[in-house]
Amino acid sequence: MTASAPAASASARLLDGRRIAEELLDGLKLRVDARLAAGKARPGLAVVLVGGDPASSVYVRNKRRAAEKVGIEAFDYDLPQGTSEAQLASLIDELNADPKIHGILIQLPLPGIPDANRLIQRIDPRKDVDGFHPQNVGHLALREFGLRPCTPRGIVTLLGHTDQPVRGRNATIVGVSNHVGRPMGLELLIAGCTVTSCHKFTPPDVLEASVRNADILVVAVGRPGLIPGEWVKPGAVVIDVGINRLDDGRLVGDVGFDAAAQRAAWITPVPGGVGPMTVATLMQNTIEAADAAESGDSGLGIG
């Protein structure tokens, strides 16, 4: 059963990631149809899943469904628990060399693999549709848009669906993971924000002050209720990346939703906010990787 998103108060408007993602996917399907009509190859996405972790299986299923919806061919590699790093490295080499594959997705975490970064770095950066390869993150740091990390790019798309400006705003990011927090800071810097990043070494009083000052607040830690909604600046845009399952089965974010919704101008629900945008952006990256492969582009300037 699909969890339902909370309803916002009369103060905040919901940034409905499900609806916006569906609109993005509809547009991507048109792009794939146009490619095929022009005699170009169907975009191909290799999806690698190791083990049977229930959460990872759900995420992979959602990605495969999105690929089918837009007309991307998904090549499924469901590998058993205990698959070694050497076996995965060999598979990545095969996928790098396969012209039918335009994007490679390695579902994280990888059970039994202590350092997944070595495998991520083995992926051809031109096929790194998650946007995790150091070369792609480096291009983002240099403001050379190529294959960008999916969640931050999806959040930028969400921000574009509000009536609030982004340029010139104070943005606070809570959480500095390699896949969300750090590249999110780069995205917001490029967009013209003054960015504050908070992390486990940020003193509590500084964290609170930074949140209270934020016109745009992005929280990506994975701790339910970490940010009290009362801290949210009136009129802010709140992007809650966290998704946490409580003992009673409810899914909640990192921000106290009810109180935050009384103060914010816009807020993402959990679930139904950032997650669908991450999946849709993965499809966007895959199509752009296919376009770049057709044109001989090294991967720069495609997004």
Curated annotation (Swiss-Prot):
The answer to keyword Nucleotidyltransferase applying to this record is: no
* Keywords linked to the UniProt accession: Amino-acid biosynthesis, Histidine biosynthesis, Hydrolase, Methionine biosynthesis, Multifunctional enzyme, NADP, One-carbon metabolism, Oxidoreductase, Purine biosynthesis
Gene3D superfamilies for this protein: Leucine Dehydrogenase, chain A, domain 1, NAD(P)-binding Rossmann-like Domain
| Keyword Zinc part of the UniProt annotation | no
Q: What is its EC number?
A: 1.5.1.5, 3.5.4.9
GO molecular function terms attached to this record = methenyltetrahydrofolate cyclohydrolase activity; methylenetetrahydrofolate dehydrogenase (NADP+) activity
Domain of life of the native organism: Bacteria
Annotated NADP(+) binding lies at 175-177, 243
Quote any Pfam family the record assigns. Answer: THF_DHG_CYH
Copy the pathway line from the protein's UniProt record.
Answer: One-carbon metabolism; tetrahydrofolate interconversion
Q: Which GO terms describe its biological process?
A: L-histidine biosynthetic process; methionine biosynthetic process; purine nucleotide biosynthetic process; tetrahydrofolate interconversion
Q: Which PROSITE patterns match?
A: THF_DHG_CYH_2
List, alphabetically, the InterPro entries matched.
Answer: Aminoacid_DH-like_N_sf, NAD(P)-bd_dom_sf, THF_DH/CycHdrlase, THF_DH/CycHdrlase_cat_dom, THF_DH/CycHdrlase_CS, THF_DH/CycHdrlase_NAD-bd_dom
The UniProt entry's GO CC annotations, sorted and at most eight, read: cytosol
Q: Which reaction does it catalyse?
A: (6R)-5,10-methylene-5,6,7,8-tetrahydrofolate + NADP(+) = (6R)-5,10-methenyltetrahydrofolate + NADPH; (6R)-5,10-methenyltetrahydrofolate + H2O = (6R)-10-formyltetrahydrofolate + H(+)
Q: Which HAMAP family match?
A: THF_DHG_CYH (MF_01576)
What PANTHER family does its record include? C-1-TETRAHYDROFOLATE SYNTHASE, CYTOPLASMIC, C-1-TETRAHYDROFOLATE SYNTHASE, CYTOPLASMIC-RELATED
Similarity comment: family membership = Belongs to the tetrahydrofolate dehydrogenase/cyclohydrolase family.
Quaternary structure, per UniProt, is: Homodimer.
> Function of this protein?
Catalyzes the oxidation of 5,10-methylenetetrahydrofolate to 5,10-methenyltetrahydrofolate and then the hydrolysis of 5,10-methenyltetrahydrofolate to 10-formyltetrahydrofolate.
* Name of this protein: Bifunctional protein FolD
Gene (UniProt): folD
